[in-house]
């Protein structure tokens, strides 16, 4: 075994050779200043979900999976992330493998559709090649693939109906993610895969649900969010939206398994004011006495809906409440396994 001085010199030489061959940052000592920078993130449009994710939103330079049943709000959540990225001056891309993107709805959620890059690929291979090229450019801040289930391999499209193509899609996803993860990390781009749920046949015990596209995405994703519609929201006899629960089932950048609930309103998306109101009541920033909601010495409304509308009409009060909710969370991001 080398003595300490010789070992240090040998290590310095080895590290300089590695950096010369593979570039600066290829190897680093974690004790050094700025060895691991703070994890940058993009807000989700829901303050409670940003707090649950631990880093203030979805982390940049990582793979994210949003999965859930049909009409649960998967695309809505992804479009909100795009909207927030654009507000920060970022460029967003949407790979619409399902050929079902509603531009009008995206616009209502605050997406600047004129600046949005949209691709409607014919095959799964084409979709993932486009995604790789965009991420490799280094200019994209967030890229959404909607959805993994619609990434149909070329062989399946060109084959006859009824042909067996066992494991083709899983192999395609595995190969693509092996190539993508490295360049996603270097480019600081947030790549969101939207996924659907399927039922495993013959499962007697445990959860019969699984996601499409094999297991590769489960492993490569730094954050996995399970989104579910838990109740319908009504105003009189009219349906105005749905109460939605999101569970962070995997999180490599903060403690996982946190759950949040918020409203998704039809034609409006995530109810930011409703979300802030619920969180403020939970944290005693807003007081609830019977049906009345009070902030400071001022009553803001009778009933949750009236209070939500008050916050919508008074953005300066909403911003003030939001600031009080965010400030104690600044040191709450506890990085887990990175």
UniProtKB/Swiss-Prot annotation:
UniProt entry keywords in alphabetical sequence: ATP-binding, Cytoplasm, DNA damage, DNA recombination, DNA repair, DNA-binding, Nucleotide-binding, SOS response
- The keyword DNA repair is annotated on this UniProt entry: yes
The record's subcellular locations are: Cytoplasm
Q: Which GO terms describe its biological process?
A: DNA recombination; DNA repair; SOS response
Specify the superkingdom: Bacteria
The protein's job, in short, is: Can catalyze the hydrolysis of ATP in the presence of single-stranded DNA, the ATP-dependent uptake of single-stranded DNA by duplex DNA, and the ATP-dependent hybridization of homologous single-stranded DNAs. It interacts with LexA causing its activation and leading to its autocatalytic cleavage.
- Which residue positions does the secretion signal occupy? none
Q: Name one Pfam family in it.
A: RecA_C
InterPro entries, per this entry? AAA+_ATPase, DNA_recomb/repair_RecA, DNA_recomb/repair_RecA_CS, P-loop_NTPase, RecA-like_C, RecA-like_N, RecA_ATP-bd, RecA_C_sf
Report the GO molecular function annotations.
ATP binding; ATP hydrolysis activity; ATP-dependent DNA damage sensor activity; damaged DNA binding; single-stranded DNA binding
Gene Ontology terms: cellular component: cytosol
The UniProt entry lists the main location of this chain as: cytoplasm
Q: Where does ATP bind?
A: 68-75
Protein's name according to its UniProt entry: Protein RecA
Similarity-based family: Belongs to the RecA family.
């Amino acid at each position: 075994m080398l003595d300490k001085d010789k070992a240090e010199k040998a290590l310095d030489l080895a590290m300089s050779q590695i950096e010369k061959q593979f570039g600066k940052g290829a190897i680093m000592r974690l004790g050094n200043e700025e060895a691991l920078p703070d994890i940058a993130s993009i807000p989700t449009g829901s303050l409670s979900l940003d707090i649950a994710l631990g880093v203030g939103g979805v982390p940049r330079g990582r793979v994210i999976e949003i999965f859930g049943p049909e009409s649960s709000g998967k695309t809505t959540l992804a479009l909100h992330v795009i909207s927030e990225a654009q507000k920060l001056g970022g460029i967003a891309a949407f790979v619409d493998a399902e050929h079902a993107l509603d531009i009008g709805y995206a616009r209502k959620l605050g997406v600047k559709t004129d600046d949005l890059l949209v691709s409607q690929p014919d095959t799964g291979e084409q979709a993932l090649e486009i995604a790789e090229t965009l991420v490799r450019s280094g200019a994209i801040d967030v890229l959404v693939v909607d959805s993994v289930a619609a990434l149909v391999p070329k062989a399946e499209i060109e084959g006859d109906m009824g042909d067996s193509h066992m494991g083709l899609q899983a192999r395609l996803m595995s190969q693509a993610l092996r190539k993508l993860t490295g360049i996603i990390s270097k480019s600081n781009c947030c790549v969101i895969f939207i996924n659907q749920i399927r039922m495993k046949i013959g499962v007697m015990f445990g959860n019969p649900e699984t996601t499409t596209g094999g297991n590769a995405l489960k492993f490569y994703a730094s954050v996995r969010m399970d989104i579910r519609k838990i109740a319908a929201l009504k105003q009189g006899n009219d349906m105005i939206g749905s109460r939605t629960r999101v569970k962070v089932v995997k999180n490599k950048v903060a403690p996982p398994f946190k759950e949040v609930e918020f409203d998704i309103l039809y034609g409006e998306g995530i109810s930011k004011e409703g979300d802030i109101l619920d969180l403020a009541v939970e944290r005693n920033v807003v007081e609830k006495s019977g049906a009345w909601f009070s902030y400071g010495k001022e009553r803001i409304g009778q009933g949750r809906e009236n209070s939500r509308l008050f916050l919508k009409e008074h953005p300066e009060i909403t911003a003030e409440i939001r600031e009080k909710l965010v400030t104690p969370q600044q040191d709450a991001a506890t990085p887990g396994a990175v």
